Amino acid sequence: MNKISRYSRRRFVQYGSLVLGSSILAACAGGSETATEATESPTASSSPETAGELTPVTFGTNWFAQAEHGGFYQAVATGIYEEHGLDVTIQMGGPQVNGTQLLMGEAVDFFMGYSADAINAIQESIPKVTVAAIFQKDPQVLIAHPNQGIQDLADLKGHPIFISKAANVTYWPFLEAKYGFTEDMKRNYNFNPGPFLQDKDSAQQGYLSSEPLAIRKEGGFEPVVFLLADNGYNPYSTTIEARREMVEENPDLVQRFVDASIKGWYSYFENPAPANELIKEDNPEMTDEQLAYGIEKIQEYGLAISDEAETDGIGAMTDERWQSFFETMADAGVFEEDVDYTQAYTLDFVNKGEEYYRE
């Protein structure tokens, strides 16, 4: 990848077109072609060769720029990545982005993933590895109308629920297994709250830090919100994924990116202004109100700092947590029981303690 100019700190979302080889498309079947700029992966040199030289790195996100990505933007905006010898370009995602294709096609060096996809990749013999988990709790929520007698998730049984296609291989099988949800409840979610607002009997999916506010503003009411992570659905979220080849051959680069990203998150919670400016530049539809709401909910519900992350630092992961999630989802029929889920992650780059990341 060519050296990214100093201007990249302010212009770090790139668009273009990516055409992946047939072998990658076959390995990562189920995705679609994604707008991006093809780049080479920095695998030959893990550290700057001379003083002041930075290693170019591209990080792909899973959605449009928002508070849930704030720590990564903060590490760019405040120079934390540069302090770790990295010149980071953040490549914004969207609803049609297939992160596995981008990662395995070497269009990005790291990608923002989640536990279910990481284990599914191992099931499909795709060599990618989760190296950190920024969110201990998945922000996925189900949202219902007030005054409909819906007090908990079990009360949604029998109601129409607007969900995305991705839900069919993530949280929906869990809801079927634990709460008795059925196929006939599903409605197609097009990332627009309109259908939900028109049907008081319905519910819809969303992100804790986004859709509830949008519904409150558009619908004029406070929705009932259920965080799935507080109701038995326990994957890691907003993870950092890398190709196994990079993890094995260039661990120093992986460590520097993970450390800098985590430090960016601590910085973001202290003063989000630098990152928020960049987020708004790259996603003009994002507002100060939405960003403030997002940060508030991330902290209120302990998405990033809870469980092991309270002592081991943001990004923390444990073998026990991965095992618990795998067994829950295997019981729900999402994963084959003989999958070696331990190949989906490594603890080598995290769990260094909060003080380490605040230095």
Label for each model-derived stretch:
Residues 320-359:
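Conserved C-terminal helix/tail region of periplasmic/extracytoplasmic solute-binding proteins
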Residues 116, 191-195, 199-287:
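Pocket-lining segment of extracytoplasmic ligand-binding domains
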Residues 37-53:
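Post-signal peptide N-terminal segment of mature Sec-exported envelope proteins
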Residues 80-84, 179-181, 218-220, 285-288, ...:
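Short helix-capping segments at alpha-helix termini
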Residues 1-27:
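N-terminal secretory signal peptides
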Residues 48-189, 193-198, 202-209, 226:
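Short, glycine-/small- and polar/acidic-enriched structural segments
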Residues 249-334:
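Secondary-structure end/capping motifs
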Residues 29-38:
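Bacterial lipoprotein signal-peptidase II cleavage site
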